[in-house]
Swiss-Prot record:
This is Rhamnulose-1-phosphate aldolase. Its EC number is 4.1.2.19. Binds 1 zinc ion per subunit. It comes from Pectobacterium atrosepticum (strain SCRI 1043 / ATCC BAA-672). One of its GO terms (molecular function) is metal ion binding. It holds the Pfam family Aldolase_II. It is found in: Cytoplasm. Pathway: Carbohydrate degradation; L-rhamnose degradation; glycerone phosphate from L-rhamnose: step 3/3. Its cofactor is Zn(2+). The active site is at 117. Keywords: Cytoplasm, Lyase, Metal-binding, Rhamnose metabolism, Zinc. Belongs to the aldolase class II family. RhaD subfamily. Homotetramer.
Length: 274
């Protein structure tokens, strides 16, 4: 048997959370990450599992995730400290066979629970499992500074926000041709915001929480991080453009269409019409 601290998924979570903190996206205990695992992923590390795994109930049944394994950041844990004490900052859990609760097999050595946004993560995992036929395994939430800033000055609709980011950096249309979904401002840590986010996840791999942060998804931690990083870089460009007096020229609709054709992606039609 191998030590779970050396596993690819624990090491991956350490790197992702450290990178997110270094980017300035996750102050204090802000942000949360979940990675869906397979039984094959976790089996080599069973010797590190708790002999009496703690059981917790879910706020609502999620039978679609029955028996699924996850590694998740802990509630109240600081991303800057994950690398110092991953066994306290992270948690490996398995959803019950009836989807009504979960058991904690490893992590949270000083007590606590998984992220307070667990419902939002699980609801989005369910949607993305269906949309991508199981390919997407990561849900990532952070407080990306410039995306939050733009939520104060742009119209809060998908077409407008997406178009602004597409124009901010040429690669954006290629990386997220499906655009950015947007939910209204809502109280975090609730089933309601999870419902609204997962509804947007049916059509978008990025979902903005105005005045709060961003949700991203992908098949790997690197892909989800890179998706958010790309959108945030474009948002930073557009914040600077606005501070310099606004656009004098930009990427045209015809050029965006040509870009999509070159890279074999289908741009969100509503954003092309803005």
């Amino acid at each position: 048997m191998q030590a779970i601290l050396s596993s690819w998924f624990v090491q991956g979570m350490i790197k992702a959370t450290s990178d997110m903190w270094l980017k300035g996206w996750d102050e204090r205990n802000g942000g949360n990450v979940s990675l869906r695992l397979t039984a094959e992923d976790v089996t080599p590390y069973e010797s590190d599992f708790s002999p009496q795994p703690r059981h917790e109930a879910l706020s609502q049944p999620m039978p679609e995730l029955a028996d699924c394994w996850f590694i998740v950041t802990g509630s109240g844990k600081f991303f800057r400290n994950v690398q110092l004490d991953p066994a306290d900052s992270l948690v490996v859990l398995q959803v019950d066979s009836d989807g009504k609760g979960y058991r904690i097999f490893w992590g949270l050595t000083n007590g606590g629970l998984p992220t307070s946004e667990l419902a939002s993560h699980f609801q989005s995992h369910i949607v993305r499992m269906g949309v991508t036929h199981g390919r997407d395994r990561v849900i990532m939430h952070c407080h990306a500074t410039n995306l939050i800033a733009l939520s104060y000055v742009l119209e809060l609709n998908t077409a407008t926000f997406t178009r602004e980011l597409w124009e901010g950096s040429t690669e954006c249309l290629v990386v997220f041709p499906d655009g950015v979904g947007i939910v209204p401002w809502m109280v975090p840590g609730t089933d309601s915001i999870g419902d609204a986010t997962s509804e947007q996840m049916k059509r978008h791999s990025l979902v903005l929480w105005p005045f709060h942060g961003i949700f991203g998804t992908g098949p790997t931690l690197d892909e989800a991080f890179g998706l958010i990083d790309t959108a945030e870089k474009s948002a930073e460009v557009m914040v600077k453009v606005r501070s310099m007096g606004g656009k004098k020229q930009t990427i045209s609709t015809e050029e965006l269409i040509a870009l999509g054709k070159r890279f074999g992606v289908t741009p969100l039609e509503a954003a092309l019409r803005v």
